From Swiss-Prot:
GO terms for cellular component: cytosolic small ribosomal subunit. InterPro entries: Ribosomal_bS6, Ribosomal_bS6_sf, Ribosomal_S6_plastid/chlpt, Transl_elong_EF1B/ribsomal_bS6. It comes from Tolumonas auensis (strain DSM 9187 / NBRC 110442 / TA 4). Residues 98-124 are annotated as: Disordered. This is Small ribosomal subunit protein bS6. Belongs to the bacterial ribosomal protein bS6 family. The keyword Mitochondrion does not apply. GO terms for molecular function: small ribosomal subunit rRNA binding; structural constituent of ribosome. SUPFAM superfamilies: Ribosomal protein S6. One of its GO terms (biological process) is translation.
Amino acid sequence: MRHYEIVFMVHPDQSEQVPGMIERYTGAIKAAGGTIHRLEDWGRRQLAYPIDKLHKAHYVLMNVEAEQSVIDELENNFRFNDAVIRNMIMRTKHAVTEASPMLKAREERPRREDVREEAEEAAE
């Protein structure tokens, strides 16, 4: 089996469907004997350029190990799902399991609530 990195972008109005989509796609991979090494839901992010007059999209990253037939089926599902506005499937040399730089940056960034609480404590 080969290793793949899959990124797909979902229409921002369809963000509530993302958990179901992830479950459906991961289920198809696991049912065919594949494994999922990394799954990250990056949430809504600003696009670098407008796509179909959209400026934001919901991003999902997966690193999987699967047969080519599973990847073909997944690509076919992306193509016929109107909620998926873009997708990219790249073959990689080995399994990637560590957190992506995007997720690391998000975890390192202080949350708004934490910053607000610290500001209130400093004001007292």
